């Protein structure tokens, strides 16, 4: 069985969220923070986490900083600990979008 989740994030909204004192550390892992150089990257990772939770069908039932989006040597994203999954993150204009597919 396949489960699919998709999320879209307005990059300017992420920019405002990143201005809040504790937002970054409550949502992103240290590895993700080190990886991100632009607001667009944070927005893409956030969208991937939301898409993952939608695919799981559980809603936001955990701290987002306990989910880690990793990248291989070619830059392909994946979810740490979710072997049966595929992740796609894209940016266009004012938006970042992510789709996650989980399978059993």
Predicted regions and their residues:
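Core catalytic alpha/beta fold that binds nucleotide/phospho-ligands
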Residues: 1-104
């Amino acid at each position: 069985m396949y489960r699919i989740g998709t999320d879209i994030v307005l990059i300017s909204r992420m920019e405002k969220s990143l201005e809040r004192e504790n937002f970054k550390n409550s949502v992103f892992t240290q590895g993700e923070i080190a990886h991100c150089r632009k607001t667009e990257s944070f927005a893409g990772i956030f969208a991937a986490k939301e898409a993952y939770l939608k695919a799981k069908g559980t809603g936001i039932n955990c701290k987002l900083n306990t989910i880690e989006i990793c990248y291989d040597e070619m830059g392909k994203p994946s979810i740490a600990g979710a072997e049966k999954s595929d992740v796609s993150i894209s940016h266009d204009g004012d938006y970042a979008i992510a789709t996650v597919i989980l399978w059993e």
